[in-house]
Amino acid sequence: MRKKLFLTSAAVLWAVTAMNSVHAATDVQKVIDETYVQPEYVLGSSLSEDQKNQTLKKLGYNASTDTKELKTMTPDVYSKIMNVANDSSLQLYSSAKIQKLGDKSPLEVKIETPENITKVTQDMYRNAAVTLGVEHAKITVAAPIPVTGESALAGIYYSLEANGAKVPQANKDLAQEELKALSDINAENKDKTGYDANKLNVALADIKSGLAKAKESKGNLTEEDVRKIVEDTLKNYKLDQVITGNQINIII
């Protein structure tokens, strides 16, 4: 049975708030600011040499200036990062580049090969990054053939943790729950009049913000509190007549 997505989110927000004061030195954004002097590249292990070069070109790799060692997303690493069974036959093609931005720059996400990333959208990557604690960075994704894009997402987690970021398992689990929920809702509403996947992604970002503010002012939130924030936000984006009651329950 799937977790209540934003009831879980509310709990995570509380845990992260408490954790920040204890683990400030390993804060995700601080790690990005201090260690990503050069961009970091995480490549899928299934890429052939030609595909690797093609993907690096799409990601903007410059061998003369990008001297940091390239990382590889293997099935073993993927299983540990995504908390799934290790499957050596897993095909991993989508790849990611993470680079730091100034502290006044917003989080940027760009899929350089949108025709080849079939499941994870730009906004899904953005939502996952926000859930992990990324505030100011540029994330670029590419793949040489049609794939879901999930190995690039795992690559972002891998890069952050390999550089010293302490990403709570609860945050990673929540990012995965969000991705699953969004993918299912997008599939169920495909071609439905009035449905806009981009609007839903923006609405979810607003819901997170609303939950954080409500938790700061009220403390623990009830399911009714979360439901009101979710329903009011969906209504604001004119999605309340499109998203079904069951889908709202999944979000909550």
Annotate the PLM regions.
Residues 46-50, 115-123, 146-154, 166-169, ...:
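Soluble non-cytosolic domains of exported or imported proteins
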Residues 24-140, 162-163:
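N-terminal, leucine/charged-rich tether regions that mediate assembly and partner docking
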Residues 1-24:
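Sec-dependent N-terminal signal peptides of Gram-positive bacterial secreted proteins and lipoproteins
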Residues 59, 63, 129-133, 159-167, ...:
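Sec/Tat-exported extracytoplasmic proteins
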Residues 64-67, 136-139, 167-171, 219, ...:
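Short, surface-exposed acidic
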Residues 52, 56, 122-129, 153-160, ...:
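Extracytoplasmic/secreted envelope proteins and their assembly/folding machinery
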Residues 145-149, 157-210:
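Long, charge-dense
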Residues 18, 29-30, 202-252:
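C-terminal interaction module
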